[in-house]
Each structure stands twice: as structure tokens, then as C-alpha cells.
């Protein structure tokens, strides 16, 4: 399957272009998709975008099987409306995939469906190890923060994996006793979204910790420097 990936940033809260591309690559490799082109946009995507040459070249090329987006909210209009606009210049149906949401928009008539999200054996084991570390009172924030960076690259990358595999991650949290991460599990061990949210919020704290650590390192290096006052 030949696909075109579409990145876009509409606000400071959106994932960076580079982060989106990394997520796309993993998703496309998992679904055996061949990336043949990349489109970068700023702001939400609507029918006006389709008027540009970059888009018309893609839409009119029936060898392109699908467009891959990061999230549904990248599209500023109805997904169905965007699909119909593209199909005016195509003879072959085109699919749309949304990596972050684990959704695809295709079929006849086209509609949303869930897609498989990749969480390989390595990531499964490392997430389990992370939960164990967070349950240990002897592990401080520095140790856990370094574990995240060493095994996932960044907190954002870890959160992307976790948010794409809510059911599995919540089941692992549910099977743990919750000590050290303040997660209460009901007696019948029901999987609750509250447990998942608490876990995610705990992880987000390590983004701040990392920034503070980097600032401390910069300040330490500055203290070592000899400042010469040139007159």
C-alpha cells in the first residue's frame, strides 16, 4: 500500500512535526505501508488545502492508496466532506488513517473503524519494568526519568505508545498493587479510566523534571566559566 503522510501543527499544544513523523514511520512499518511522499501543513486542513499543487498531485494520483494523519482533529471540517472533495478528482477510492486515534476512514460507503496499534514485545516488557520501578519506594524520580529516556527516548514517545494502547496498559496497572503511584484498584479488579489517567499524569511530571535537570546542568557549566569583563 502506497501512502502519503500529512503532518500539521495548529497550536503549541500539538505534537511537533518531527514527533508526528516518527509516529507515522512506526505505524506505517507495522501496517506494511510504503511512504512515497510527505506533506507539511500549518493549521487545520480543509478544502482550501486541496487547491494547492502539492495536494492535487497526490489526489489525482490513483497509485496513492491512502493518506496518513496524526489525529482526526487535524482536519478542520468533516472527514466525510474532505473525502468527498478528494474523490471528485479520483477514480479510485482513497483511505485515511489516523495514527494517534487508531482509526481508519474507508470502505463503501466510507466510515470510521478501529485499527491495530503496534506495541511490540520490547515496549511491553519495558512498560512493565517501568510500572514496577514506579511501585518501588526506593526508586527516586531521577532513576525513573533516566529509565524513560534510555528506553523510550522521551516522555512524549512513551506517552504516545501508552495512549495508543490504553486497554493493555490499564490491565498491567490493574494487575499491579498500585503502591508508590497512588492508584487504587477496585476489589473485583475492574479496569478504570481513572487509574489510567493517574498513571499518565504521573508520567507527565517527568517532562518537567527533565527540563529542570537540564537547566541545573546549564547553570553548573556557567558557574565553571570565567567571565571576562572587556572594557
Swiss-Prot record:
Cellular localization per UniProt: Host nucleus, Host nucleolus
Induction per the UniProt record: Expressed in the early phase of the viral replicative cycle.
Pfam families: Pox_F16
InterPro entries, per the entry: Poxvirus_F16 (IPR006798)
Domain of life: Viruses
Broad class of where this protein is predominantly found: host cell
This protein's UniProt keywords: Early protein, Host nucleus
Cysteine pairs bridged by disulfides in the record: none
Cellular-component GO terms for this entry: host cell nucleolus
Assigned protein family: Belongs to the orthopoxvirus OPG058 family.
Name this polypeptide is given: Protein OPG061
